[in-house]
Amino acid sequence: MKEKYELIFKDFYNYLLFDKNYSLNTINSYLTDMYDLLMFIDKSSNQEITLHNLSENDIRDYIKDLSKHNMSERSISRKISAFKTYYKFLIIINKIKNNPMEFIIIPKQNKTLPTVLSIEEVLTLLDIPLNTPGDYRNKAMLELMYATGLRISELINLKMSNIDLELNLVKTIGKGSKERIIPVGDYATEYLKEYIYNYRPSFIRKNNSEYLFLNRSGNKMSRQMFFKIIQKLALEKNIKTKFSPHTLRHSFATHMLEYGADLRTIQELLGHSNISTTQIYTHLSTDKLRENYDNFHSNA
């Protein structure tokens, strides 16, 4: 069924990629959102409804349906954003005259602070018994992620050519196809060298993949597989803090700030285009400061 709509969204895909300069993750999310909307239309009793004549009320009905099925506000907001972008695109290419999304507002969300591990929890998580090639690969991935603050998508898309083991640097392409170069500490670099020279060869198959971190089939590791590895380790280590795919990235930024790094440096390391995105970590550090004050100040 999904293949049926690939041609419909081909031009939209190109618009997001080349005109809007969106990341592939964002593009895939938007296309999935549009596909879900099409499924809703297909199930409609009104066979006259199409993407091009969908009304504002039709979309509002769909949004209500999502809420009834307990979809989170964040997910609904992203879908609305996808629909707005799509119908703006249809206006630009003169496919429609009236925009059904014009008066539909993206609901404001309460900013939730990202989950962060304590330094002790990070050290516990990274203390991996090294018995198999997979253990050495996982150790190198986790050490590199915590040492650099890379996003999971950036980590798994690293190629051998992106690593400079002599200068201790990693080059990555982040959101908006922006390139950045990040220093890597000696400790993480040693585990990278160990993996690359001694254990990565055991993952190489006939395809001889150029990606740095490989699965047992010799292909690039998926986001899902890497996150499962982290979750499994956290469970084994009895780490109670709730995990998200970016927990190590958030922990990297927060610990950098706590140890005196300035906000602008952290912004550059994380690849944030706007420093306001980075400022959320100041709230985390303030919360930690308050906790320590309450625990240790005699008059707190």
Which residues are covered by each model-predicted region?
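Conserved catalytic core of the tyrosine transesterase superfamily
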Residues: 1-300
